[in-house]
């Protein structure tokens, strides 16, 4: 049976967003990249020179920034827009944003604002959501829950491959950064990262995006258009 909602969880750098978007294209689903939404909040905090440790101030920023988020459903799925621009096209991967994300994402009121957007998208049609607490908190009713399990070394290698010429980080530096983020996500008081009891765990160290998507498509029992 074709699932209406697919939850994809996993640690930082596990490929949730990439695989989720590829799967959304194959299935004609809307794709909600939770990480990008929190990055949008982090950018708002930085742009407004707001203290990321001030919960009430961060909440005000999140409400203001996320007010402009809309979903444009199409015949091929759906696009998350911010003030009329696709969320995926915004520049949200600067190092200062990356460092700020876990600090703003730890606040429960902020997470609830984000959850309201996620649940609204789910209510409007077939949706794929990628994050760290999708299957456990955001959409525990999702018909298909996935957890992408990737070694720290492989995640760091992927980050290194994708980094810009200006970054020039070493494998050890990236591993340390990812390990720190993993610890913060696991130990967060609000909605910590964990594997849902009914999630399918997929180890993707030696798998391509297309191979992973093919496995998920097979789980859905569907024959779909080949990846372009």
Where do the PLM segments sit?
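Walker A (P-loop) ATP-phosphate-binding motif of ABC ATPase nucleotide-binding domains
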Residues: 5
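Hydrophobic anchor at the beta1->P-loop junction of P-loop NTPases
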Residues: 8
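P-loop (Walker A) phosphate-binding loop of NTP-binding proteins
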Residues: 11
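Conserved lysine of the Walker
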Residues: 16
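Hydrophobic positions on the alpha1 helix immediately C-terminal to the Walker A/P-loop
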Residues: 19
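N-terminal phosphate/diphosphate-binding loop that engages ATP/GTP or pyrophosphate donors
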Residues: 25-92
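ATP-dependent NMP and nucleoside kinases share a basic, alpha-helical "lid"
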Residues: 88-165
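Small-molecule kinase domains that catalyze NTP-dependent phosphoryl transfer to phosphate-bearing small molecules
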Residues: 118-124, 132-137, 141, 166-215
């Amino acid at each position: 049976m074709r699932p209406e909602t697919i939850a994809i969880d996993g640690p930082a750098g596990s490929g949730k967003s990439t695989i989720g978007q590829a799967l959304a294209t194959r299935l004609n689903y809307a794709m909600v990249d939770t990480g990008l939404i929190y990055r949008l909040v982090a950018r708002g905090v930085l742009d407004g020179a707001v203290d990321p440790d001030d919960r009430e101030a961060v909440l005000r920023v999140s409400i203001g920034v996320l007010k402009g988020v809309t979903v444009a459903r199409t015949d091929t799925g759906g696009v998350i827009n911010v003030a009329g621009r696709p969320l995926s096209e915004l520049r949200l991967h600067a190092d200062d944003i990356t460092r700020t994300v876990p600090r703003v994402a730890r606040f429960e009121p902020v997470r609830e604002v984000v959850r309201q957007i996620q649940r609204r998208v789910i209510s409007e049609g077939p949706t794929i959501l990628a994050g760290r607490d999708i299957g456990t908190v955001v959409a525990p009713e999702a018909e298909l829950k996935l957890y992408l399990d990737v070694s720290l070394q492989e995640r760091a290698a992927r980050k290194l491959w994708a980094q810009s010429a200006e970054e020039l980080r070493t494998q050890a530096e990236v591993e340390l950064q990812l390990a720190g983020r993993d610890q913060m996500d696991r130990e967060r008081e609000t909605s910590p990262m964990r594997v849902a009891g009914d999630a399918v765990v997929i180890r993707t160290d030696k798998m391509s995006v297309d191979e992973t998507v093919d496995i998920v498509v097979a789980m859905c029992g569907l024959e779909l258009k080949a990846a372009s």
